[in-house]
C-alpha cells in the first residue's frame, strides 16, 4: 500500500480525499510538478521546486511552506513508501472556497504529494521510435494562459492528446497561434539537421527541466545548438526529431504526420543523448536515504 502526503498527514492512497469545493478540483486552480527519482536519488529536485514556486507566484498563489520544507516532504513521502525509482507529483491547490471564482475566498492552499513506482513511459518505443501528429488545437497563447505556468488546468494538453490518439499517434505536436512548432502534449521538442540541433524558445512552451539538462549535455558534447522558431517544414525535413520530459525522458520520433523522419529509425545523435542522459540520472540527484 502506498501513502499520499496531504496537508501534514500521510494517508493511504485509496483513502485520500479532496473536497468537492477545492478550487483545484472545481477550476484547475493550482499548480503541480512532475519529478523523477532514479536509484535512490531525486533528479533536479531544487529546479523542480523552484519552477513550482514560480508557477504559484504567477497565479498569485502563496505556498504556505518554504522550498526547503517542501523538498523534505517529498523525500519523506518517498521514504514512507520505500521507493527508489519513482514518479513524484507535488500539487498545490488554491484550497477550499465556494462555487464562485473569487480566489480570495480560498484561505488555505492544499499541499499534496503523490509518489508512484515508475518505469519507461513509452516502453519499447524508445527502441522503435514514436509516431507523432501535429494537431489542430493550438497551444495556449503566452498572453492568455502562459505555457510556462504548470497549472492544474491541462485541458489544452488533453485535447491535443485526444486528437493524436484518434489519428493513431503516440504523441501530439502543438503549433502556436502563429503556426510555429511549440511542444508535445507533455514534452519539449528538438530537431536534428546536418549534425546541428535546434529547439523552440520557451516563450510558447514549458521551460522544461529535462530540456535544460539535455541542452547542457548537447553543449558538453560540442554539438552545434541554437534556440530558434521551428516550422512544420523543419520537422518534415529533419534528420532526427526527439522530445524531452520528466516522464518521457528522451524519446525519438520517427514519423510525423505520416512522413518518415530521416531513415525512420531513432538517429545516432538522439541515441547518444539518451545514453548520456541515462548516465546523468544515475549520478546526479538528492539522496532519499541518508
Curated annotation (Swiss-Prot):
Taxonomic lineage from the root: Archaea, Methanobacteriati, Methanobacteriota, Archaeoglobi, Archaeoglobales
Species whose genome carries this gene: Archaeoglobus fulgidus (strain ATCC 49558 / DSM 4304 / JCM 9628 / NBRC 100126 / VC-16)
GO biological process: isoleucine biosynthetic process; L-leucine biosynthetic process; L-valine biosynthetic process
Family: Belongs to the class-IV pyridoxal-phosphate-dependent aminotransferase family.
Enzyme class label: transferase
Positions of post-translational N6-(pyridoxal phosphate)lysine modification: 150
Chain ranges passing through the membrane: none
Protein name from the UniProt record: Putative branched-chain-amino-acid aminotransferase
InterPro entries in the record: Aminotrans_IV, Aminotrans_IV_CS, Aminotransferase-like, B_amino_transI, BCAT-like_C, BCAT-like_N, Class-IV_PLP-Dep_Aminotrnsfr
Amino acid at each position: 500500500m502506498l501513502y499520499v502526503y496531504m496537508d501534514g498527514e500521510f494517508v493511504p492512497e485509496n483513502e485520500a480525499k479532496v473536497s468537492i469545493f477545492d478550487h483545484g478540483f472545481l477550476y484547475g486552480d493550482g499548480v503541480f510538478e512532475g519529478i523523477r527519482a532514479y536509484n535512490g536519488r531525486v533528479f533536479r529536485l531544487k529546479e523542480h521546486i523552484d519552477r513550482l514556486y514560480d508557477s504559484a507566484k504567477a497565479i498569485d498563489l502563496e505556498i504556505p511552506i518554504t522550498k526547503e520544507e517542501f523538498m523534505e516532504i517529498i523525500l519523506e513521502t518517498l521514504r514512507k513508501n520505500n521507493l527508489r525509482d519513482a514518479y513524484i507529483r507535488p500539487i498545490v491547490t488554491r484550497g477550499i472556497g465556494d462555487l464562485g471564482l473569487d480566489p480570495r475566498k480560498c484561505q488555505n492552499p492544499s499541499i499534496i504529494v503523490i509518489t508512484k513506482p515508475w518505469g519507461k513511459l513509452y516502453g519499447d518505443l524508445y527502441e522503435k521510435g514514436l509516431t507523432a501528429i501535429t494537431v489542430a488545437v493550438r497551444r495556449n497563447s503566452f498572453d492568455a494562459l502562459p505555457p510556462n505556468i504548470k497549472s492544474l488546468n491541462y485541458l489544452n494538453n488533453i485535447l491535443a492528446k485526444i486528437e493524436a490518439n484518434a489519428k493513431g499517434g503516440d504523441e501530439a505536436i502543438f503549433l502556436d497561434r502563429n503556426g510555429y512548432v511549440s511542444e508535445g502534449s507533455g514534452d519539449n521538442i528538438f530537431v536534428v539537421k546536418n549534425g546541428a540541433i535546434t529547439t523552440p524558445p520557451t516563450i510558447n512552451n514549458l521551460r522544461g527541466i529535462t530540456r535544460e539538462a539535455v541542452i547542457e549535455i548537447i553543449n558538453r558534447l560540442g554539438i552545434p545548438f541554437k534556440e530558434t522558431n521551428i516550422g512544420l517544414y523543419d520537422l518534415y525535413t529533419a534528420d532526427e526529431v526527439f522530445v524531452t520530459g520528466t516522464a518521457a525522458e528522451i524519446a525519438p520520433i520517427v514519423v510525423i504526420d505520416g512522413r518518415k523522419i530521416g531513415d525512420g529509425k531513432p538517429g545516432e545523435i538522439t541515441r547518444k543523448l539518451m545514453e548520456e542522459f541515462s548516465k546523468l540520472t544515475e549520478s546526479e540527484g538528492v539522496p532519499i536515504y541518508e
